[in-house]
C-alpha cells in the first residue's frame, strides 16, 4: 500500500518537528532532503498522528547513517587598528581560528584587516580591540555563512550540549 496524499502534510510536519533537535548536539538540522517512497495505510488505524510519529522515527533511524556534521556560524570581520598593532591583531585572529583575507592602509597610520572568523571565537573581541589599541581601533562583524565545525572541536561541543541538557532536565 501507499500513503494517501492527505497524510503528506502530517509526514512533513513530523519530519520538521524532528529536525528541530539534531542527533549530535541537539542543534536544528539544516539542508536535509527527505523523500517519501512508500508506506502502508490502514483505513481504521491510520491517522495524522501515526504518520507524524512514523516520520519522526524514520528521521531518528536514518539520520545517523547520513554522517551528520555540526555547522558553526562564520562572521565577516573588518578591523581598523593602528599600524603598530597590525601584527599583534593578525596573531590574535589566527589564535581565534580566523582567516585573514587582506589588509589595506586606510591613512592616519591605520590599517584595515579583512577576515573571516567563527562567531564563537569573537565573544570578547570588542574588549580585546580596545585593550590592544588603547581605544583607537574598531571593528565590524556580521554573519556570513555556516561552515563545518572542525572535527577536533566536535566532541567538546557535543559533550557541552549534553552537559547543558542534563542541567536543564
Language-model features: locations:
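Accessory interaction regions appended to the cores of large information-processing enzymes
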Residues: 1-169
Amino acid at each position: 500500500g501507499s500513503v494517501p496524499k492527505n497524510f503528506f502534510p502530517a509526514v512533513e510536519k513530523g519530519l520538521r518537528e524532528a529536525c528541530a533537535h539534531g542527533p549530535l548536539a541537539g542543534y536544528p538540522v539544516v539542508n536535509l532532503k527527505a523523500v517519501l517512497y512508500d508506506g502502508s495505510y490502514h483505513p481504521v488505524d491510520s491517522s495524522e498522528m501515526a504518520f507524524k510519529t512514523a516520520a519522526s522515527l524514520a528521521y531518528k533511524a536514518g539520520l545517523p547513517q547520513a554522517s551528520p556534521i555540526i555547522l558553526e556560524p562564520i562572521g565577516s570581520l573588518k578591523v581598523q587598528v593602528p599600524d603598530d598593532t597590525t601584527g599583534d591583531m593578525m596573531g590574535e585572529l589566527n589564535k581565534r581560528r580566523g582567516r585573514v583575507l587582506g589588509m589595506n592602509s586606510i591613512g592616519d597610520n591605520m590599517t584595515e584587516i579583512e577576515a573571516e572568523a567563527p562567531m564563537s571565537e569573537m565573544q570578547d573581541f570588542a574588549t580585546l580591540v580596545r585593550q590592544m589599541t588603547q581605544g583607537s581601533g574598531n571593528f565590524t562583524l556580521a554573519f556570513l555563512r555556516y561552515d563545518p565545525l572542525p572535527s577536533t572541536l566536535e566532541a567538546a561541543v557535543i559533550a557541552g550540549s549534553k552537559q547543558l541538557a542534563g542541567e536543564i532536565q
